[in-house]
Curated annotation (Swiss-Prot):
Record GO terms (molecular function): heme binding; metal ion binding
Keyword Cell membrane: yes
Record-stated family: Belongs to the CcmE/CycJ family.
Protein name, as recorded: Cytochrome c-type biogenesis protein CcmE
Length: 147
């Protein structure tokens, strides 16, 4: 093998390795991706039972029900549509009615969203970006009254 052929084979091998690494990275990221939806978006989205998504909105007033142990049921709304959510675990301290939340999980076969994580807004001025953008797009955004 000449020097030129060796160099060419090293370059081709390096490019093949880089391409394989890039492909595996995108494949792994695609498997872990969870898409964000507001409750009203779910009517037009093709979300399959078991598919991981993030569901965001406001905790609907009067829907928080504490079950046995650490199980909690509540509804997430964007003021147009509501989705029933169940969660087993410790809720954030700031979780309460009419506050912004993002839940991550999947729909069960019964149509109830089974969350494995719940994130609540931090203070009266903070709202998760996805939730705020979704509420603004639906025309139901309310500015903070504490200013």
């Amino acid at each position: 093998m000449t020097r030129k052929q060796k160099r060419l084979s090293v370059i081709v091998g390096g490019l093949a390795f880089l391409g394989a690494a890039t492909g595996l990275t995108f494949y792994a990221l695609g498997q872990k991706a969870s898409y964000f939806y507001m409750p009203a978006d779910l009517t037009t989205a093709s979300v399959q039972p078991g598919q991981r998504i993030r569901l965001g909105g406001l905790v609907e007033k009067g829907t928080i029900q504490r079950g046995q142990g650490a199980t909690v049921a509540f509804s997430v709304t964007d003021t147009h549509k509501s989705v029933k959510v169940t969660y087993t675990g410790i809720l954030p301290d700031l979780f309460r009615e009419e506050q912004g939340v993002i839940t991550e999980g999947s729909f069960g076969p019964d149509g109830v969203f089974v969350a494995d994580s719940v994130l609540a807004k931090h203070d009266e001025r903070y709202m998760p970006k996805e939730v705020a953008d979704g509420l603004k797009a639906k025309g139901v955004w309310q500015e903070s009254k504490s200013e």
